[in-house]
Amino acid sequence: DEFDKLKYSEDDPSIYQLSAYAAGGETFKTSGTAQLQWDVLKENDYEVPRTLDEFETMLKDYIAAHPTTDDGLDTIGFTLSTSDWHWMITLGNPAGFIADGAPDNGQWIVEENNNAMYKFHSDKEREYFRWMNKMYNEGILDPEFATQTHEDYIAKIASGRVLALFDTDWDYGDGEKVLKADGKYGKTYAPLPLAMDADTKCPSLMYQGLTTGYGVGITTSCKDPVAAIKYLDYICSDEGQVLVQWGIEGVNYFLDDEGHRYRTEDEVKYATADKDYQKKTGVGFHNYPFPCYGNSVEDPTGSTYTTTNKESVMADYDEEQKAACEAWNVELLTDIFPQADEFTTPDYSPIWAYAKPTEFDEIANQLDEIAWSALISCVIGSEEEFDASYDKMISDLENAGMADAEQMLTEIIQEKVAAVQ
């Protein structure tokens, strides 16, 4: 359905590259736009905070009732990791998700008519950072966030004293592993569909369409392009997809009485416990950068192409996750989020994956360097200084060529969209 998105341009509709990312499917897991300890949710009878005001109240009430942990450590409302590139994940990205309800397009927002905006230029994000500044001055945001290392950040999470995060699970996961090893599942994190206000919709489950820009192609120096095409053709076939996603029948998977694929408990444990499972078995090893189906897409037999499906995700839930699903009367944690069918799939692919000219990248890098330090300054300054600090950042971004970068990216997006329409 999205094959045309692979076209190079309107003037040159050739396809030089296949996508390295999954086509179609459903999202069964998400970190949400923010994360909150299960213990906090339980104390609030599993009420889900959906706005910043509700989130703030819940944090303040819990800190008032539990100023220290059982280990005697001061409770921290939430913390951030901003000493290196992680600032984009914990300080930058959540602003777009929460304030603008925007999907992940890196440092950019795409407005009406496919016009690009450097996201910190957004009025809504100004208000989001104003809230961050307020949380810092009231002691809810960790006063050490701006000076700590990423290792410090993970250690605080592992201590169980941090009630909330604005992050993604692959980043804070090492801290959670320590908590789980200590049996402190209540101190691990629930994904939340948090937004700035009731009028903003959390975009976590939004399908952004086929990701193009990163992928696999055949070079002009390829000695046997016919063989390469045959290989790609096989990888994309039903047989090829089952082989790379599931492995070998009778070894890595079996068929039930209805002819549907399943894995034994031992195989599932092997796949999750052995970090070299993919290399040893080949299962999942050839997914990236080759084309593959997304989760829940079914083959002609009614089996899913991937091993990740609704049932496997539910079976993997821990005690806290199962209790929450029961309290919410849902099957999946993602059921409390705005669903994918509530959103329109954009005409463009995720912007972060697009190839961009060197001139654009040079300006964009300057913009990010300015925003990195300036946003931290905005957050840690006094509430009275906030607007002046934010205005200075916008002025510095404009002087660094923000308008030129926005125009260049707008032209790239509109050219890509024109190739499809």
Protein language model regions, located:
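A ligand-binding cleft/hinge motif common to bilobed small-molecule-binding domains
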Residues: 169-182
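Glycine-rich, aromatic-bearing surface loops/beta-hairpins
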Residues: 211-214
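Histidine-centered catalytic/metal-binding microenvironments
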Residues: 373-421
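Second-shell loop/turn segments in exported
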Residues: 43-48, 115-119, 352-361, 375-383, ...
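Helix-loop-helix "hinge/cap" segment bordering the ligand-binding cleft or interdomain interface
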Residues: 9-87, 110-156, 161, 165-168, ...
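Hinge/lid segment of periplasmic solute-binding proteins
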Residues: 1-32, 89-128, 132, 180-209, ...
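Short, 15-30-residue, compositionally biased linear elements
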Residues: 100, 119-128, 358-373, 388, ...
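Conserved small-residue motifs centered on glycine
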Residues: 240-373, 380
